[in-house]
Curated annotation (Swiss-Prot):
Domain of life: Viruses
Keywords: Host membrane, Host-virus interaction, Membrane, Phosphoprotein, Viral budding, Viral budding via the host ESCRT complexes, Viral envelope protein, Viral matrix protein, Viral release from host cell, Virion
Organism: Australian bat lyssavirus (isolate Human/AUS/1998)
Domain statement: Late-budding domains (L domains) are short sequence motifs essential for viral particle budding. They recruit proteins of the host ESCRT machinery (Endosomal Sorting Complex Required for Transport) or ESCRT-associated proteins. Matrix protein contains one L domain: a PPXY motif which potentially interacts with the WW domain 3 of NEDD4 E3 ubiquitin ligase (Potential).
Protein name from the UniProt record: Matrix protein
Length: 202
């Protein structure tokens, strides 16, 4: 077993900093409800504080015995406490992680890799969100480890403002992305300007 655990750690990128550990998930971790103020973004009519971002996102899951979304969701519930990137763009990062993990993974050795490359429309509430022209290069590794199981989560997100027409970032409330955003406590509010839009509060 110790030999296997040494092999497992080879599927992670070497890093001098020890990634944060997350505690074990509770048994009822699969119970969830979307945040009550969340409204799916459908068609934007208001233009205030709206920005298009060209996004490259990657979430790499490393686990020798497969993994369940119950554990991934449990890890992401601690995201606010362990996030190490630009806090003016934490809402954008949460959206990208949710969308990436909603796609199909590509196996890569002991890893499963989820990728997202898309232009997305974001709207922030007044005085929230990134500065004008601000870009993001975010990379972090998070691990969950106990005597029986190890999961490494490597997250990379790059974002730059661009003029390509963006897409909506939520299609229906029952999607896996919305479930993950609920887990990560994505902070939003309904737009006063457009009842079909959600403004990011982070």
């Amino acid at each position: 077993m110790n030999f296997l655990r040494k092999i497992v750690r080879n599927c992670k990128d070497e890093d001098d900093q020890k990634p944060p550990l997350v505690s074990a998930p509770p048994d009822d971790d699969d119970l969830w409800l979307p945040p009550p103020e969340y409204v799916p973004l459908t068609e934007i009519t208001g233009k205030r504080n709206m920005r298009n971002f060209c996004i490259n996102g990657e979430v790499k899951v490393c686990s020798p015995n497969g993994y369940s979304f119950r554990i991934l969701r449990h890890i992401l519930k601690s995201f606010d406490e362990i996030y190490s990137g630009n806090h003016r763009m934490i809402g954008l990062v949460k959206v990208v992680i949710g969308l990436a993990l909603s796609g199909a993974p590509v196996p890569e050795g002991m890893n499963w890799v989820y990728k997202l490359r898309r232009t997305l429309i974001f709207q922030w509430a007044e005085s929230r969100g990134p500065l004008d022209g601000e870009e993001l290069e975010y990379s972090q590794e998070i691990t969950w480890d106990d005597d029986s199981e190890f999961i490494g989560l490597q997250i990379r997100v790059s974002a730059r403002q661009c003029h390509i027409q963006g897409r909506i970032w939520c299609i229906n409330m029952n999607s896996r992305a919305c479930q993950l955003w609920s887990d990560m406590s994505l902070k939003t509010q309904q737009s006063e300007e457009d009842k079909n839009s959600s403004l990011l509060l982070e």
